[in-house]
From Swiss-Prot:
The modification Phosphotyrosine is found at residue 125. Cu cation binds at residues 2, 50. Residues 99-140 are annotated as: Disordered. It comes from Rattus norvegicus. This is Alpha-synuclein. One of its GO terms (cellular component) is axon terminus. Keywords: Acetylation, Cell projection, Copper, Cytoplasm, Membrane, Metal-binding, Nucleus, Phosphoprotein, Repeat, Secreted, Synapse, Ubl conjugation. It holds the Pfam family Synuclein. It is found in: Cytoplasm; Membrane; Nucleus; Synapse. It comes from the Eukaryota. GO terms for molecular function: actin binding; alpha-tubulin binding; arachidonate binding; beta-tubulin binding; calcium ion binding; copper ion binding; cuprous ion binding; cysteine-type endopeptidase inhibitor activity. Phosphorylated, predominantly on serine residues. Phosphorylated on Tyr-125 upon osmotic stress. Ubiquitinated. The predominant conjugate is the diubiquitinated form. The modification N-acetylmethionine is found at residue 1. Residues 128-140 have a biased composition (Acidic residues).
Length: 140
């Protein structure tokens, strides 16, 4: 029973770690997209640059929103997967239903994923500083 519950706990931790990596990857991709769009914008005529910068900012905002949704979705899937595995274990007689979700002392365990904050404004969403960018000055 303890081995089974520890295995489920480790599975939850793995899914949470994967979700964090996904969130970081999405944020990094948004930064790279912005860099690329700004580079192209610096090579275009004056009137287009403002539009390209606006598109880059909107892309960054949307990716941030999607990143938060991905983490929330993965967290929900992980929780349902663990619940389903526990139900299967109880149905097959591997563990007793009255022992499901209880620690060694017999008290209910706190869920890892329920208490995990999902904050789209966390550090994983910080974009690279724009110090390396320079405003476009059109040639006369």
């Amino acid at each position: 029973m303890d081995v089974f519950m520890k295995g489920l706990s480790k599975a939850k931790e793995g899914v949470v770690a994967a979700a964090e990596k996904t969130k970081q990857g999405v944020a990094e991709a948004a930064g790279k997209t912005k860099e690329g769009v700004l580079y192209v914008g610096s090579k275009t005529k004056e009137g287009v640059v403002h539009g390209v910068t606006t598109v880059a900012e909107k892309t960054k905002e949307q990716v941030t929103n999607v990143g938060g949704a991905v983490v929330t979705g993965v967290t929900a899937v992980a929780q349902k997967t663990v619940e389903g595995a526990g139900n299967i274990a109880a149905a097959t007689g591997f563990v007793k239903k009255d022992q499901m979700g209880k620690g060694e002392e017999g008290y209910p365990q706190e869920g890892i994923l329920e208490d995990m904050p999902v904050d789209p404004s966390s550090e994983a969403y910080e974009m690279p500083s724009e110090e390396g960018y320079q405003d476009y000055e059109p040639e006369a």
